[in-house]
């Protein structure tokens, strides 16, 4: 899980999701692409 000020989709499987007011990237193909805005 990377914590970044600016999060971007890294591949076509990445999805932007808002959970509890926090923007996240989840990726089914590559778990290393997981990110959180913070």
Curated annotation (Swiss-Prot):
One of its GO terms (biological process) is translation. It comes from Saccharophagus degradans (strain 2-40 / ATCC 43961 / DSM 17024). The keyword Manganese does not apply. Belongs to the bacterial ribosomal protein bL36 family. It comes from the Bacteria. GO terms for molecular function: structural constituent of ribosome. This is Large ribosomal subunit protein bL36. It holds the Pfam family Ribosomal_L36. The keyword Ribonucleoprotein applies. Keywords: Ribonucleoprotein, Ribosomal protein. The gene is rpmJ. Coiled coil: none annotated. GO terms for cellular component: cytoplasm; ribonucleoprotein complex; ribosome.
